[in-house]
Amino acid sequence: MQITRVLLLPFSLLALCGSAQTLSITHARVIDTITGQIRRDTTVVIDGNRIARIDPSSKSVPKAAKIINAHGQYLIPGLWDMHTHVYFDRTAADGDDLILPLFIANGITGIRDMGSKLDAVLNARDGVASHRLFGPRMIVSGPMLDGPKSQYKAAIPITTPEDGRKAVDLLKNRGVNFIKVQSGVPREAYFAIADESKRVGIPFEGHVPDAIRASEAISSGQRTFEHLIGIFEASSPDETGYLTGKKSPGLFLASYDPAREATIIELLAKQHVWQCPTLYWERGQWLVDVIDYSKDPDLAYAAHTWVDKLWPQSQQSILKSLDTDPVAIRERFVSHELDVVRKLHTAGVPFLAGTDTPAGVDVIPGISLHLELQRFVAAGFTPLQALQTATLNPAQFYNKLDEYGTIQAGRLADLLLLKANPLTDIANTRSITAVIADGRYLSQGDLNRLRSRLRRSAVMK
């Protein structure tokens, strides 16, 4: 019976949100994610999965519309998590039944998946698009390209340049949206991957591999840097040694050179290389022995196998790699990361909000994106700028400003209603009263029922 309940969950969730319809959200406070201005007492009319028009609430609404009175509430675009691994190393059912619905339950209506099993993630992307599966819009890489000794199940091991070219061709032909490179890709294979990606017309993004300088990744056309990898190495006179040697927070801090840091920041800004720093995940990695996830108030949404097995295993594995750096050094490095993000932002380097969920300890899908926005504010972003990393910026990154990222007529109807203003406190992005995903409306009651089902699903995983 337990198996039957799990398998039936996606179908019951689809029934929960119904289909797109004509909606009129009246008396809302609509936040402009470009300027930060708020249009008060505004009606947003949705027809199907598109915003049809935006008017003062004094104007009449379509007679057939379902009316949602949003008096006193704030309307923002749906959020994007730009670094996820939905089908990373467990069964497809975990992604279908728990991870994807958790995104919607927390207002994440779009994700960039940075490494998952190929068939599972392609099926999910297409299933969500056709409303056969309950979840956010998905931009996917399929499996990562990693080195010959990759530890990941959702990776293609690469040894030679020819391996790299073949992998790019395979993934391009299967229909992935971009290529993800991991840290272990060998040097010559990396350049082959970059060259082949350009040749076949597919973006490549991800880690700056251990064998590659940040400047080389930039000149090769790598579109994003994840986790700030490459920047710390480039900020040190020991950068060449880091290509083949050990790295650690203590070593990075000891060899830090502000002038070299300024040089790499200037280059990143000039070439407009997007950064997805995963700050919440980073803090959890470096302080894994300090943070007590058992006290997380949202722990009920984490699969019990994550909590009981995977997270303790990850803790031990991470601690083994950190045994030479005391907590005080690692705390300094976490602060240093925030300072680097502040400098990058001041220089005009563009940012995307991402979490690496469900990889990492206590990085719960959906919930962690809100915590990531709070880390951006801790790094010196205004609440509006932090909000932009999960709304406006993903749309700019994909050249889709005509589709999402703002609330305007003609845009896709991916929206959140909030009780409180996120521009005064970014934590208010969690005060969700309704989610509209591809035109499908989930009320507060629907969300409460969804979250209850997901807590039950987490127990069974």
Which positions does each model-derived feature cover?
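Boundary at the C-terminal end of the N-terminal hydrophobic targeting segment
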Residues: 18-22
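Divalent metal-dependent hydrolysis catalytic cores, especially in the metallo-beta-lactamase
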Residues: 99-119, 135-143, 170-185, 202-205, ...
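Acidic, glycine-enriched loop/beta-strand segments at the rims
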Residues: 30-43, 56-57, 335, 364, ...
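Active-site neighborhoods of metal-dependent hydrolases
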Residues: 170-185, 231-379, 455-461
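Divalent metal-coordination and catalytic microenvironments
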Residues: 28, 44, 49, 72, ...
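Bacterial N-terminal signal peptides
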Residues: 7-15
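Histidine-rich, glycine-flanked metal-binding segment
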Residues: 30, 34-76
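Metal-associated gating/positioning segment near the N- to mid-region
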Residues: 73-132, 148-152, 156-162, 188, ...
